[in-house]
Amino acid sequence: MTIFNAVDKFTMMSGDRVKIKDLLSSRLTECGWRDEVRLLCRSILQEKGAISSFTVEQLVTEVTPRARSLVPDAVKKELLIKIRTIFDENEDDDIDPEDA
């Protein structure tokens, strides 16, 4: 099991997954990331607009790596700290991320 999968299952079982998603969503909105990605999508659609067979899946495939690279380091760091805090707070609980 990968670390990502272990963290995902642990946060889902502990009920903290929604809190992390809400924090990420609000931070991405605050820093303007959502607007940047929206503009990126528009730009790609205008560029590929002549191609009638351009699908949503193709748009997602093209936008995803660029959108991920646009996430500010401060947001990534804050989320990492939040996840570590959740693990530390639940360290003595019965939920073991390796068993998740």
Swiss-Prot record:
Pfam families on file: EnY2
Keywords assigned: Activator, Chromatin regulator, Cytoplasm, mRNA transport, Nucleus, Protein transport, Transcription, Transcription regulation, Translocation, Transport
Molecular function GO terms recorded: C2H2 zinc finger domain binding; chromatin insulator sequence binding; TFIID-class transcription factor complex binding; transcription coactivator activity
CC per GO annotation: cytoplasm; DUBm complex; nuclear periphery; nuclear pore; nucleoplasm; SAGA complex; transcription export complex 2
GO BP terms: heterochromatin boundary formation; mRNA export from nucleus; poly(A)+ mRNA export from nucleus; positive regulation of transcription by RNA polymerase II; protein transport; transcription elongation by RNA polymerase II
Main localization, broad class: nucleus
The keyword Acyltransferase appears for this protein: no
Keyword Transcription regulation among record annotations: yes
Signal peptide: none
Role, per record: Involved in mRNA export coupled transcription activation by association with both the AMEX and the SAGA complexes. The SAGA complex is a multiprotein complex that activates transcription by remodeling chromatin and mediating histone acetylation and deubiquitination. Within the SAGA complex, participates in a subcomplex that specifically deubiquitinates histone H2B. The SAGA complex is recruited to specific gene promoters by activators, where it is required for transcription. Required for nuclear receptor-mediated transactivation.
Family: Belongs to the ENY2 family.
Name of the molecule in the record: Enhancer of yellow 2 transcription factor
Organism: Drosophila persimilis
